[in-house]
């Protein structure tokens, strides 16, 4: 439990400002922007790391890298904790269209050492780009991420008035059978504050999803340990809960992530991050100048 808790806290440490749009801004800077001029100075694998920038890989770097003036070993976390944050245990050469991978070229040897010590199954052949099976606890960290962020995004949308109270309540109620819904309605008659009602519903949904993901994990333990289990735990939950979860995901995409306020922030993020990268590159290239 402590390993998973620590990994949950650490796994997003490498995300840039503006979240996933920040990752895209960094990638685009190098693939389409002024960073293209640096391509000739980098190896193909280093270039892949930059043009498919990934926050999870950056988290692994931050946690393990010996930065200037610091002790060796980064944050000096246990191997199990470090392995538990690597959701995509392969190099950027295998990133694909989703640009997901687990470690930069600069930390590839570190992950190989961790995998060797923990006995993590290597899936790639010696002449292929590096790819491993996941550490079993990755599935629990990923499930916690999938559950918490999806449900909290719905609650946040309610607070920001992107979703009405009835819409939000309806999305959460989908997760329960008729008997449980009646009990929830009884609580809501006592707790009249609408934000408290939604917080109670969100917490109840989270509990149901945790219980169901736990079932999926324990029932597929052998496949997980052998590196044969495919996909996150959340896609294998029972049909009623899966349908309700997918409905929340669809609404979040349509009404939250694509809202004008969010898109305005993303556009601003592109400009901010591009400017910051320019300044940092210039500082490295011309250290004699004052900025």
Q: Where are the regions that the model predicts?
A:
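Non-transmembrane, amphipathic alpha-helical segments
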Residues: 132-139, 194-205, 233-236, 257-268
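Substrate-recognition/cap regions that form aromatic- and gly/pro-loop-enriched pockets
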Residues: 219-291
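Charged/polar positions within long, soluble alpha-helices
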Residues: 64, 149-152, 156, 215, ...
């Amino acid at each position: 439990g402590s390993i998973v808790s620590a990994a949950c806290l650490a796994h997003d440490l490498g995300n840039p400002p503006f979240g996933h749009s920040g990752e895209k801004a960094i990638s685009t800077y190098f693939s389409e922007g002024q960073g293209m001029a640096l391509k000739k100075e980098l190896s193909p694998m280093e270039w892949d790391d930059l043009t498919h920038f990934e926050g999870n890989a950056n988290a692994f770097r931050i946690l393990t890298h010996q930065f200037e003036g610091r002790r060796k070993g980064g944050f000096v976390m246990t191997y199990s904790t470090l392995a538990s944050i690597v959701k995509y245990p392969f190099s950027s050469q295998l990133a694909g269209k989703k640009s997901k991978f687990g470690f930069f070229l600069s930390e590839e040897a570190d992950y190989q050492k961790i995998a060797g010590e923990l006995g993590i199954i290597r899936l790639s052949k010696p002449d292929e780009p590096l790819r491993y099976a996941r550490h079993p606890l990755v599935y629990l960290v990923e499930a916690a991420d999938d559950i918490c962020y999806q449900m909290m995004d719905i609650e946040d949308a309610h607070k920001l008035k992107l979703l009405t109270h009835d819409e939000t309540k309806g999305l959460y109620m989908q997760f329960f059978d008729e008997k449980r819904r009646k009990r929830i309605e009884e609580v809501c008659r006592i707790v009249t504050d609408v934000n408290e009602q939604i917080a109670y519903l969100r917490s109840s949904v989270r509990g149901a999803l945790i219980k169901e993901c736990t079932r999926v994990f324990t029932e597929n333990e052998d496949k997980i340990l052998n590196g044969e289990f495919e996909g996150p735990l959340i896609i294998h939950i029972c049909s009623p809960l899966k349908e309700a979860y997918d409905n929340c995901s669809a609404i979040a995409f349509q009404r939250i992530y694509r809202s004008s306020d969010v898109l305005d922030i993303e556009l601003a993020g592109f400009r901010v991050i591009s400017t910051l990268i320019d300044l940092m590159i210039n500082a490295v290239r011309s250290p004699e100048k004052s900025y």
